């Protein structure tokens, strides 16, 4: 299997994944993807869009990035691509509805989005566009990417 990594991924922020892929003998190439951050070179029917944490997800779904994110979900749906959003942070007790935005050192919330609102918005995105959401740890993320891409064609 050869994994395609989107060229718009920030350099140096994904070394853990790249190292894991190399250790597993999985080749990678960089190319601009129409949706997501990772897919297979030989079968692009699944794309994985990674988010570093729930705060980034909240910004994409309920914040200033909503239109761009929605457009990406719509494009995936139109192209018959299964889009999996892999969030590299596990919410409290496995329930994003319990999530609370982190605070700055001054005690100000980094986002006004509440966990319950985010959970409902995620359900709406799944219902309308078929996008799937999964939560994992940063350390387990590379293995989960490989698992999801290996499922293609089974």
Annotate each predicted stretch with a short phrase.
Residues 1-43, 56-154:
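Non-catalytic C-terminal interaction segments of nucleic acid-processing enzymes
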Residues 46-52:
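Conserved catalytic cores of phosphodiester-cleaving nucleases, focusing on short active-site segments
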């Amino acid at each position: 299997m050869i994994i395609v990594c989107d060229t718009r991924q920030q350099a140096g922020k994904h070394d853990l994944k790249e190292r894991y892929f190399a250790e597993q003998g999985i080749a990678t190439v960089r190319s601009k993807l129409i949706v997501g951050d990772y897919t297979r070179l030989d079968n692009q029917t699944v794309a994985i869009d990674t988010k570093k944490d729930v705060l980034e997800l909240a910004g994409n779904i309920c914040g200033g990035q909503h239109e761009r994110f929605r457009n990406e979900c719509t494009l995936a749906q139109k192209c018959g691509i299964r889009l999996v959003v892999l969030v590299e942070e596990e919410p409290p007790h496995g329930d994003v509805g319990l999530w609370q935005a982190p605070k700055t050192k001054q005690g100000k919330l980094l986002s006004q989005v509440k966990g319950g609102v985010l959970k409902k918005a995620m359900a709406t995105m799944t219902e309308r566009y078929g996008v799937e959401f999964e939560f994992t740890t940063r350390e387990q993320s590379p293995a989960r990417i490989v698992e999801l891409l290996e499922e293609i064609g089974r």
